[in-house]
Amino acid sequence: MKKLFLVLAIAASLQAFDAQAQVKSPAAALSAVQKAEATTQNAKQAAKAATWVKYADALMDAYEAPKGNFWLGMSRQEIDMLGGGEKPSAEQAVDVAGRQMTKLVYSNKNLYLNENGQLEVIEVSAPLVDDVLTKAFDAYKKAAELDAKGQKTKDISEGLARAACAGEVNGE
């Protein structure tokens, strides 16, 4: 019976994992930012809203990439199983706002597990791009200025909402 529950739990975890947006590797995300940024330097391409939306989207992917395949609510077992081979360099008991949490230290991020062993905070300690959210916001703003016909309004609105939500989470 225990084996059946274990198999069902693993299947549910894998299904939840597939439901998550596929996160680019940090190297791929940084490469995409560099390529999109180079496109914005081309005068002909820089006059198109789509160029700026693509650049802003690449910046947002670069913002998310260091988080890896982790998501809020993961259990410690899921972190160990689905972490993509990443292992923490240190594990510490820390006090966060009066709450005892377990801090898992990685090369580019810190994961904070609550008292129930669930992932509650993902702190990126080594962002791929400096001031990435401001740059993404500015790129979406530039896209909106160039989108006279309103063809990219939906993409711009979704991107701005994504950037704003990320900024709220990080207190920016």
What are the roles of these predicted feature ranges?
Residues 58-172:
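Short coil/linker segments at helix-helix boundaries
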Residues 19, 42-43, 123, 158:
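A general structural-boundary detector
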Residues 1-29:
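Bacterial Sec-dependent N-terminal signal peptides
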Residues 6, 38-41, 145:
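Generic surface-pattern signal
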Residues 19, 38-39, 119, 154:
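A near-ubiquitous, low-amplitude feature marking generic local secondary-structure context
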Residues 20-67, 71:
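Start-of-domain marker
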